């Protein structure tokens, strides 16, 4: 027993420093920094963030040389004779054809550090030389990163040559000070009816897309990139964290087709950072930080309003759990890392609006077994300004986007922000849907005939509203067969207000399915009437 206790306390002690490491930088690792194309080298924002973007330094390469003493999967122990590298420093393995970066996670004593590899450790041998870079992982940033795909350490992976920038930034940075933050509240119009009406997104806010496997998180993110990034006209950063490589490839080619990425000149609007499912846990645990670092450059150096898309933030937590286990930390609830809240908080606090610019973040959040009380999604909830919950029950009805209108919430659903008309229509829609939900048990047992006339009218309008909340997406045209629609907020409010007022009680409910504005539903009803005539 004493031996076990001793080992546990030793493990806890060795975990203390890495925990501090995580607190120091929300995203750890080498993530390619994707930057905006506007200005030349900009002045640093302040002494606190001076290290974040500077002209490429001749890093203190060779400040210390160590040798590998152990390799356990993605964990590599390195011993130094002198000049022990601090926590979070990047080390580089010598004598390899491909670059392998290690990030210092723990100091073990006897001049040995335990590191996490950012790539596969195949072929490593004991005694191999390792060089301390003298700094955390640094990635290229600046206009040259737009239209390019990078990995976690900033290497281009799109086979289009090197990224020729003089700007580099460390992926670990502090969150902005309170005095730098802005409290302005504005709606970010997405053109998606159910989102804009019932759970509007705040400009400069954090939005979570919750859903189980296969209910449409990635498609919704792609539609948001399509709608918001184009209309918004600024720069976007997409961080692919632990998701399917095929989807990342599809997204890249769709962006080229839609003109968001231009291969011929420097007019691309988006930078891509990928650390997909096949990457080691170290890369997946840091790639979100790489993407965030790119977005921070746009915000702090160029004063841009940046859109940051992360697909999937759960994989960031999952990779952190794998790394934690490899480092020998005692797991917490449901097997997650004991530093779960710290890891999440240090990253999320960097995503904010300052007086110079904003980062509006849309994060897809996989919900294991559709259980919203799982520690990973539950920890994320606390940081969000709006939640869009995707429901399997709604997807089974064939209604897409499968957004749950009663579970989805927004901090800015306030009459003082969205206006009284929008607020009243949204609450009216939610009330009639809730009434319909409470009547469904009666309908299932007794049938529609047993309802009062008032309840029958409620059910009819609710079913029309439910179908009108569906919408054809531009990015899904290929497999839905419906032309995608982007609906302005005024049109959305007008349409639902008229349905609530009973102006379309005479139209069949199927006329409201997969249409854009209300005029299309009326036209579809006329077409249906002609077909049945």
From Swiss-Prot:
Name assigned to this protein: ATP synthase F(1) complex catalytic subunit beta, mitochondrial
Transit peptide: 1-53
Protein localization: Mitochondrion inner membrane
Reactions catalysed: ATP + H2O + 4 H(+)(in) = ADP + phosphate + 5 H(+)(out)
Entry membrane topology: Peripheral membrane protein
General function of this protein: Catalytic subunit beta, of the mitochondrial membrane ATP synthase complex (F(1)F(0) ATP synthase or Complex V) that produces ATP from ADP in the presence of a proton gradient across the membrane which is generated by electron transport complexes of the respiratory chain. ATP synthase complex consist of a soluble F(1) head domain - the catalytic core - and a membrane F(1) domain - the membrane proton channel. These two domains are linked by a central stalk rotating inside the F(1) region and a stationary peripheral stalk.
Keywords: ATP synthesis, ATP-binding, CF(1), Hydrogen ion transport, Ion transport, Magnesium, Membrane, Metal-binding, Mitochondrion, Mitochondrion inner membrane, Nucleotide-binding, Transit peptide, Translocase, Transport
Binding site for ATP: 214, 216-219, 244
One Pfam family hit: ATP-synt_ab_N
EC top class, as a word: translocase
Binding of Mg(2+) 2, residues: 243
Binding residue positions for phosphate: 214-218
NCBIfam families the record matches: atpD (TIGR01039)
PANTHER family named among the record's database cross-references: ATP SYNTHASE, ATP SYNTHASE SUBUNIT BETA, MITOCHONDRIAL
One GO term describing the cellular component: mitochondrial inner membrane
Taxonomic superkingdom: Eukaryota
Positions that bind ADP: 214-219
Single GO term (MF): ATP hydrolysis activity
InterPro entries tied to this protein: AAA+_ATPase, ATP-synt_VA_C, ATP_synth_F1_bsu, ATPase_a/bsu_AS, ATPase_alpha/beta_chains, ATPase_F1/V1/A1_a/bsu_N, ATPase_F1/V1/A1_a/bsu_N_sf, ATPase_F1/V1/A1_a/bsu_nucl-bd
Binding site for Mg(2+) 1: 218
Any one biological process term the GO annotation gives: angiogenesis
């Amino acid at each position: 027993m004493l031996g076990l206790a001793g080992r546990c306390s030793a493990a806890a002690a060795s975990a203390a420093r890495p925990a501090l490491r995580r607190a120091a930088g929300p995203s750890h690792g080498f993530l390619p920094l994707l930057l905006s194309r506007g200005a030349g080298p900009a002045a640093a924002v302040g002494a606190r963030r001076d290290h974040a973007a500077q002209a490429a330094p001749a890093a203190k390469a060779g400040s210390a040389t160590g040798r590998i003493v152990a390799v356990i999967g993605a964990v590599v122990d390195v011993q130094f004779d002198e000049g022990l590298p601090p926590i979070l420093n990047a080390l580089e393995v010598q004598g390899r054809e491909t670059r392998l970066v290690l990030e210092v996670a723990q100091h073990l004593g006897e001049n040995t550090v335990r590191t996490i590899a950012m790539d596969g450790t195949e072929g490593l041998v004991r005694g191999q030389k390792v060089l301390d870079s003298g700094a955390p992982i640094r990635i290229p940033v600046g206009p040259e990163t737009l239209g390019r795909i990078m990995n976690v350490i900033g290497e281009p992976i799109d086979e289009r040559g090197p990224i020729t920038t003089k700007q580099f930034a460390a992926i670990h940075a502090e969150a902005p000070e309170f005095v730098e933050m802005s409290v302005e509240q504005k709606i970010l119009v997405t053109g998606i009816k159910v989102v804009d009406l019932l759970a509007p997104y705040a400009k400069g806010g954090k939005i979570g897309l919750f859903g189980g496997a296969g209910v449409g998180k990635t498609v919704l993110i792609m539609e948001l990139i399509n709608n918001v990034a184009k209309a918004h006209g600024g720069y976007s950063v997409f961080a692919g964290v632990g998701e399917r490589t095929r989807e990342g490839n599809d997204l890249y080619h769709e962006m080229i087709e839609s003109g968001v990425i231009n291969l011929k000149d420097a007019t691309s609007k988006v930078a891509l950072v990928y650390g997909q499912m096949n990457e080691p846990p170290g890369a997946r645990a840091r790639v979100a930080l790489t993407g965030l670092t790119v977005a921070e450059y746009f915000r702090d150096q160029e004063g841009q309003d940046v859109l940051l898309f992360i697909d999937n933030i759960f994989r960031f937590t999952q990779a952190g759990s794998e790394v934690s286990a490899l480092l020998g930390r005692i797991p917490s609830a449901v097997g997650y890392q004991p530093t779960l809240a710290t890891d999440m908080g240090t990253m999320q606090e960097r995503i904010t609006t300052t007086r110079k610019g904003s980062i509006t973040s849309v994060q897809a959040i996989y919900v294991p077994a559709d259980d919203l009380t799982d520690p990973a999604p539950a920890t994320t909830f606390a940081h969000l300004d709006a939640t869009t919950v995707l429901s399997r029950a709604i997807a089974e009805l064939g209604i897409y986007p499968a957004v749950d209108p009663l579970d989805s919430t927004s901090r800015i659903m306030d009459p003082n922000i969205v206006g009284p008309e929008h607020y009243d229509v949204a609450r009216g829609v939610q009330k009639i849907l809730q009434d319909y939900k409470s009547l469904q048990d009666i309908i299932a047992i007794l049938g529609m005939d047993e309802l009062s006339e008032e309840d029958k009218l409620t059910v009819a309008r609710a079913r029309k509203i439910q179908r009108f909340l569906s919408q054809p997406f531009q990015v899904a045209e290929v497999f839905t067969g419906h032309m995608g629609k982007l609906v302005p907020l005024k049109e959305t409010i007008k349409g639902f207000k008229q349905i609530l007022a009973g102006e379309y009680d005479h139209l069949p409910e199927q006329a409201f399915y997969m249409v854009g504005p209300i005029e299309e539903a009326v036209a579809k009803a006329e077409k249906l009437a002609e077909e049945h005539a």
